[in-house]
């Protein structure tokens, strides 16, 4: 059985104004991942995601590339203990 965990990621590059958060939400819902994504004042996007480990790996791989019009320069990740979220929200 795949364990459940959470991760916090910070994504920098051209990641605001390119539908990054909305695209992340769509994929997260497909992968049954909960959490949230928000823009930061410094131009980065912060993502907090919880789900099965294999699904989080797939999601993280996508975060490193982003949607079509994005350019990801750096994507950092911190694994965190499981938290029970119901949905994935764009903040």
From Swiss-Prot:
What Pfam families does its record include? Acylphosphatase
The EC class name is hydrolase
Tell me the active site. 21, 39
Q: Which GO terms describe its molecular function?
A: acylphosphatase activity
Which reaction equation describes what this protein catalyses?
an acyl phosphate + H2O = a carboxylate + phosphate + H(+)
Record domain Acylphosphatase-like: where: 6-91
SUPFAM superfamilies, A to Z: Acylphosphatase/BLUF domain-like (SSF54975)
PROSITE patterns in the record, alphabetically? ACYLPHOSPHATASE_1, ACYLPHOSPHATASE_2, ACYLPHOSPHATASE_3
The domain of life is: Bacteria
UniProt-listed Enzyme Commission number(s) = 3.6.1.7
Q: Which keywords are on file for this protein?
A: Hydrolase
Family statement: Belongs to the acylphosphatase family.
Name of this protein: Acylphosphatase
Q: What taxonomic ancestry is recorded?
A: Bacteria, Pseudomonadati, Pseudomonadota, Gammaproteobacteria, Legionellales
Q: Which gene encodes it?
A: acyP
């Amino acid at each position: 059985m795949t364990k459940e965990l959470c991760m916090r990621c910070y994504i920098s590059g051209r990641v605001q104004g390119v539908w990054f958060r909305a695209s992340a939400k769509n994929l997260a819902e497909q992968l049954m991942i909960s959490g949230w994504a928000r823009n930061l004042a410094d131009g980065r996007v912060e993502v907090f995601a919880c789900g099965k480990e294999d699904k989080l790996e797939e999601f993280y791989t996508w975060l490193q590339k982003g949607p079509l019009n994005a350019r990801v320069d750096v994507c950092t990740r911190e694994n965190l203990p499981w938290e029970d979220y119901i949905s994935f929200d764009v903040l």
